[in-house]
Amino acid sequence: MNRLQLTASVVEREPVRYTPAGVPIASCTLQHRTEVVEAGIRRQVELTMPAVAAGEASGKLESCEMGVETLFTGFLAKKSRNARTLVFHITEMQGTGKD
């Protein structure tokens, strides 16, 4: 199963683009910060991740306020067929009420 849920905030956004079939694609960079316990040791986790949303989800991503924590759900895929870089493909999102 390839499913990812991440609480993050949008820190960069690109203009919406359209596929040849007319599907809107929104691209952004997400930032995530948290503290987790691994093997009994507290660990700070900070990361930025490229993300895209297609179709109806692109409109929702465009309306997300920059810097506001949001719960994103989706999957990971290669940026392109021959790339090693992963991109988070967002399919759902909901505000968490935290910022």
Regions found by a protein language model. Name each.
Residues 1-99:
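Single-stranded nucleic acid-binding surfaces, predominantly the OB-fold ssDNA-binding core
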